[in-house]
Amino acid sequence: MSHIFIGIIAPSTVLIPIGVAIYKYARMPLSLRYIFFYLIISACINFVAILLSYQSINNLPLLHLLTFFELFLLLYYFSCLFEYKISITVKYVCWVSLLFCLVNSLWLQSIFSFNSYARGIEAIIIILVSLLYFVRVPEKQKTPWDILIVSGLLLYYAGSFFLYLFSNFLKKGHRLSTMVWDVNASIVLILYLLITLGIIKCKRQMTTSTSFS
């Protein structure tokens, strides 16, 4: 049952925010379109990963690929939320971190093993940028949808940091490993729920603003 929850149920919930985003796409700002493509790529890669898993084929190379796309799309999402100087800095961090991911996959950690170094660095970057959003963006410039989405990302990457950092030391099939993956899957559910609410909130806020213009 735990295997089904971790491998199928939790990843499949990404379809909820994707469905809402498709319906609301025309009204979404550029920042949320980065989130939309983040969801699409996550769904596609997770779907292929599930198929490979059932064929007993190592699907970890897909995780290396997913990390690369996650960093690019999420950091470009964040770059839309900050003023110019911070936005440019976030983009520089994005490309440096992508270079590290490439180096990690080619020389440090095999694509057939869990890329814990890259995932750990990714988690740290997203955590720091999320905190920077709450600290540096003026309250009047924060939108309800971005607050929901950034909160979800902060929760997910903060909660998953331990998993990314120590995954290679958690033996497969060990009780602790199963518990950690269960917690991670639960956080994924919360992330997708908050993104869904954020996309819905964006539509409502934009509609309200338009009606008074």
What are these regions (language model features)?
Residues 1-213:
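Terminal, non-globular segments
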